[in-house]
Design a protein with these regions (language model features):
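C-terminal motif of bacterial Sec signal peptides marking the signal peptidase cleavage site
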Residues: 18-21
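Short, well-ordered beta-strand elements
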Residues: 25-35, 54-59, 126-127
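Short, polar/charged alpha-helical segment
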Residues: 34-57, 65
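Short helix-initiation/N-cap motifs at beta->coil->alpha
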Residues: 58-68, 156-194
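Ligand-binding "clamshell"
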Residues: 88-100, 113-116, 198, 212-227
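A conserved helix-loop-strand patch within extracytoplasmic ligand-binding domains
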Residues: 100-150, 264
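A bilobed periplasmic-binding-protein/Venus flytrap-type ligand-binding module shared by bacterial periplasmic
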Residues: 107-118, 234-253
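Periplasmic-binding protein-like
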Residues: 135-146, 256-279
């Protein structure tokens, strides 16, 4: 009987937590990465939604489980990824997610470790890059744009899509003159900042650098991603929701709040050139 009561209590607590989350019509629940996402939500978007009669509840969650959390109705939306990542980490059927709005763009940069005080990439040095396919191509394109390496044709399938062997990254690139003996190592994104000092340099996504390198992140930047309006739009971080919730009032309110010029001002004043405000309403696109 005691065991049964415990089970019933657990079920009630779970049901109650769900009801206070996605089911509360005046509360919008969003899971997000800590920086800059949760900070933008709490400090810029939350006050705007409050004016519209909504309470925004933000939970910092590991990025690897945010899509499944929204797909399983634990949250109304998430905010951590760009469209290319969502395209390779989505669900099918009634759990499918869609991009509701683009909000900001984070520059991908090459950061120097403590090993490299002159902050200049030279021949024979080691470079760590992220190991998820949607960001590997981006890291290689950054290095290619500064004539550090060429991406071999073997990295692209016949249909033009990118493919990469994370266990043997150097087989997919050719380092150019002056960098011939450099080498790449693929590292789990959550470990990039921790392991940076094991290498000379690291190509690290913006939110990971902001969180993991702290106030020191800007002083470590060696090279920044060269951007165009097209690349910014393609890699802008999004609000993602379940496809079945596309037309919900909560989704519409959240997307509309992201458009407010106060969000743009906040992002610019808080993060400078590291994070660029870029809004696109994808619900009406």
């Amino acid at each position: 009987m005691i065991k049964l009561n415990k089970l019933l209590i657990s079920a009630f607590v779970l049901s109650a937590s769900l009801l206070t989350g996605c089911s509360n019509e005046n509360t919008i629940t969003v899971c997000a990465s800590e920086l800059p996402h949760a900070k933008i939500l709490n400090e810029a978007i939350k006050p705007i939604l409050k004016e519209k009669g909504y309470n925004l509840k933000v939970t910092v969650l590991d990025w690897t489980i945010q899509n499944s959390a929204v797909a399983n109705d634990e949250y109304d939306a998430n905010y951590f990824q760009h469209v290319p990542y969502l395209n390779t980490n989505n669900f099918e059927g009634d759990k499918e997610l869609i991009a509701a709005a683009k909000v900001h763009y984070e520059k991908l940069c090459l950061y120097a470790s403590d090993k490299d005080e002159n902050k200049k990439l030279d021949n024979g040095e080691t470079i760590e890059i992220v190991n998820d396919e949607s960001n590997i191509e981006r890291a290689l394109l950054l290095l290619s744009s500064y004539n550090i390496l060429e991406i071999n044709s073997s990295c692209y399938k016949k249909d033009g899509s990118f493919t990469f062997d994370t266990s043997n990254p150097n087989s997919c690139v050719t380092f150019l003159s002056g960098y011939k003996n450099c080498s790449l190592t693929c590292i789990l994104e959550s470990n990039l900042c921790v392991s940076l000092n094991d290498y000379n340099f690291g190509v690290i996504p913006g939110n990971t650098a902001l969180t993991g390198l702290g106030d020191d992140y800007a002083s470590r930047i060696v090279l920044s991603e060269k951007t165009t309006e097209e690349t910014i739009s393609e890699r802008a971080n999004i609000i993602a929701v379940k496809k079945s919730n596309k037309d919900s009032e909560k989704t519409k309110a959240l997307v509309e709040a992201c458009k407010d010029e106060r969000v743009a001002t906040y992002v610019s004043n808080t993060f400078g050139d590291s994070v660029l405000y870029h809004y696109e309403d994808l619900l009406t696109a």
